[in-house]
């Protein structure tokens, strides 16, 4: 490992440490993430040829075409990152439109309960199954908006929000469209929809239920429900009940339609999100036109053109910085070397290898980790490495559920961290060990099913 490679790793680790101690340094994590991005890629450009020869052995352009090649690599990573960012912005805007126009009012009525523990289980179950249909990112945004309607105490809401992260990641792990890593494995033909649902569903449930059982001990007594009328809660008082329900179903139904749109058109998911946003935007404009509002009324402040300013840009920039910094680690070969090293150290024990990969996925982005594994391990005709084999199914589970162990270990965690202002330190102290217990329990459950039930 060269000095330059070590320097890049040091910059990443230092930035990661500063993000982890945001509550102490009082420096916004988005600023640190952007500095990580620039620092890692600037060091990379000091001697890119060694990395081109390592990661792109087919490159024959020499020094003359080096800059052009690296520029293309960065643009490719930026394109991949951009699809995530546009998806995030679109989903956040859609949920904001539904929320501000009273679309979640009736959901609030359905979820309403005075018992803190009863609400915890309703939130857990709804998040789990919604994440399997949508994705953990969109589900987390929707559930946080619903929680804000139900829970006024921020300390209690942090507990609920933490369970949203765990349930969203667990729910996405057993569904071929629930998480970006399962989508990758499914599209590559390494797992089948029927196989991953049949064998990962129960471990995923276990990884959610056990943390929920522990977390409910942190919640005692009854909720103080926010006393807000439907008209106040809707923000736009002149919207009828039918219009509010239309906004809800166009928004949430549209989000459910996104994976269907992707499977039909084979376009990236962000295109489907933009389609839903366009349809919902048009519908609300038609509703407003029928209200004949003046330009300065309160209701017009809730139109999409006004709501766009409410999108949390610091979260978007944080995503940009983290994903691009991790892509630099991928380009210097660190992630691939790490995966190969795990296989050697643990002598091909796939439970240990995938288990460690799951832990690592809570530290760095799980996408390059899974991509590295897909490139390192060939598909076998039979055995653990076959389609729907132990390795690939455990990889889907571990890469998805493992991200719950740290709040910045998954897209769901990062979004909830930004929306609810949960610090890295608080989550690590109170939630990480709980998520880890659920994670291990799910692996043990999978081992039991494969070893005993499938052996019958």
What are these regions (language model features)?
Residues 1-4, 24-27, 55-59, 66-84, ...:
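Interfacial loop-to-helix junctions that mark the boundaries of transmembrane helices
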Residues 4-7, 153-154, 158, 174-175, ...:
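Juxtamembrane and boundary regions of transmembrane helices in multi-pass small-molecule transporters
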Residues 6-15, 26-63, 81-93, 244-254, ...:
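Hydrophobic mid-bilayer segments of alpha-helices in multi-pass membrane transport proteins
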Residues 9, 34-35, 85, 120-125, ...:
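Hydrophobic alpha-helical transmembrane segments
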Residues 40-51, 78-79, 130-167, 171, ...:
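Membrane-interfacial helix-loop connectors
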Residues 43-76, 92-109, 129-141, 328, ...:
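Transmembrane alpha-helix boundary signature
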Residues 60, 79, 101, 108-110, ...:
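Transmembrane helical segments that form the transport core of multi-pass membrane transport proteins
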Residues 79-89, 195-213, 265-278, 352, ...:
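Alpha-helical transmembrane segments
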